[in-house]
Amino acid sequence: RVVFHAGAPSTLAESHDAFGLTRVAIDAGNVEDALTASGSIPIVSDPVEDIAGAAPGDFWDGGLIDYHLLLPHSRLDGIVLYPHFVPHVTPGWLDKFLPWRARPRAHPWLANVLLVAPSRAFLDRLPSRKLPDRNDFYRYGLDHAARIRDWERAIAECERFADAAMAWLARPDPSRVRTL
């Protein structure tokens, strides 16, 4: 596991699991490769090789072990903003579909986390009542026009959501904040 970071390295990702951790400062010489690697899907995409500042090797997205990353955020001062596409954190990835793994649970490491996620009411306004995802390529098959139409509708709803979020930030309403 390699974490590319800006500013002083955080102790947030210290040994909390069995995987090692190397920190690399992000700079103009490695930011493009680090961002590209963060979107390179293991087994599907080619790796980014030998990122400047890091040990030589191949780099992919860490989603296999760090998807829905659960770190000891409570070690940090203040509130940690966690924009996400679902209203809960399920650490791990490969076993996420197991019923006992999918249930949202409170965790002490999330005590100071403000998770921002779409509401059920928002999702109900989207085509298929969900955010677009890679499964849509299977669902729509070769009907690209329908997939694009529905994705554009979802984008328009997301833009409305962004406008509403900006309005909320201008005039916060704590009554709309929910606990994890």
Predicted regions located by residue number:
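Patatin-like phospholipase
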Residues: 1-180
